[in-house]
Structure formats: C-alpha cells, structure tokens
Design a protein with these regions (language model features):
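Hydrophobic alpha-helical transmembrane segments of multi-pass membrane transport proteins
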Residues: 1-54
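Hydrophobic alpha-helical transmembrane segments in multi-pass membrane proteins
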Residues: 47-59, 89-93, 137, 141-142
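Membrane-interfacial helix-loop-helix connectors in multipass membrane proteins
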Residues: 57-81, 150-162
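Transmembrane helix segments
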Residues: 93, 97-151
Length: 192
C-alpha cells in the first residue's frame, strides 16, 4: 500500500532530475509556494491507485482469513503505519532525486533504491543480520511493512515494532529535506 500511495502522491520525485537538467527548476524557485510542493503537485498520477486498492484487498482478505479483529486503536496504528511507510519511500526517493544537483541524472540511483524495496516484501527475519540492519537503519524499508505487520499480528510488541515506523519516517524526512535544502543552497541556475 505505501508503494502505491508513494507512486500516486509523490511521482514528482521522478521529475526532479528533469527539472534540474532542463533548467525548469528556476521557474519553480520563483513561485511563492514550496519548491517541493510545486514539484509534487505537478506530477500527481493515478498510477499507484491500483497498487493501493490491491493492497487493501489483500489486507482485508488476510484479516478475514486469520479471523483477526482489530481494535479502533490498532486500525489507527495501521493507517498511521501506512502513511509512515509512504513517507519513508518518498524521503528515500527524494534523497536520490536530489543527487541530480551534482550528477547528470540520478534516476539510476532512484531505481536502485526502489529495487531494494523488493526485499521488504518478505519478512526480514529470513535475511542475514547485516541485511536486516541495512533494511532497518540505512534504507529503512522494513518499517514500511515488516515491523508494523509484526506488531499488528501480535508477533512482536517491542518498542521498535510500534514506534519504529514513526521514528524512521521522521528521521528520513528530516534527512531528505536537509539534503534538499543544502542542494538548493549550492544550486546554480542552468543559465549560469
């Protein structure tokens, strides 16, 4: 679900290299709105809605099959965890897109990081410890699915399982925004 929401709401991150390369970022910098908001608002697509709907259907089917009844508090946690997962994916894409200020095209890095998200489709417990740490603390895709799911299913109730998605989303957003602001401070217009 977070991947679909990211594709729906934040497809604009994929346009950042183009804006920088073509010099059209200059036009956005002159607007009174946030540059990031302008980029995201320009490229909202319906592309990810299919993933969101399919993900919701799978979740509902799974809840029925497991005969799992979620309390209102757990439903609220689930919604917040989905939003946190979406923000984590956005922040990772934005970090890679921001590299376009220094390299010709950072879309290869964006694709690489998005491909790493494939690891989060499986429980991270099946991976070696190094990869578990990488997926938890370097490229924190584990907080998009594994940790929240483990908490919702009652498998794990440790602090990292319920608070981790919120912390990971907050930290990743702060890092990506700081990197973006640093890149903007170093930016020289395409004209000079």
């Amino acid at each position: 679900i977070p991947l679909g929401l990211n594709e729906f709401l934040f497809a604009g991150t994929w346009a950042v290299p183009r804006y920088i390369g073509e010099g059209s970022l200059d036009r956005l910098l002159l607007r009174p709105l946030s540059t990031i908001f302008s980029i995201m608002a320009a490229d909202v697509t319906l592309h990810g809605l299919g993933s969101v709907l399919f993900g919701l259907a799978v979740c509902i089917y799974s809840l029925v099959q497991l005969e799992l009844v979620l309390s209102p508090l757990m439903v609220l946690f689930w919604i917040c965890a989905i939003l946190c997962g979406t923000l984590i994916q956005y922040a990772l894409n934005m970090l890679m897109a921001t590299l376009s200020f220094w390299v010709i095209n950072s879309q290869s890095a964006m694709v690489l990081v998005q491909n790493i998200s494939e690891f989060s489709k499986y429980p991270i417990a099946i991976y070696q410890k190094g990869l578990q740490l990488f997926l938890s603390f370097v490229v924190p895709y584990a907080f998009c699915s594994f940790y929240p799911s483990s908490f919702l299913l009652g498998v794990h109730t440790d602090l990292i399982y319920w608070a981790g998605p919120f912390l990971a989303a907050g930290v990743m957003l702060l890092i990506s925004w700081a990197f973006w602001r640093f890149a903007l401070s170093q930016y020289q217009s395409a004209g000079g």
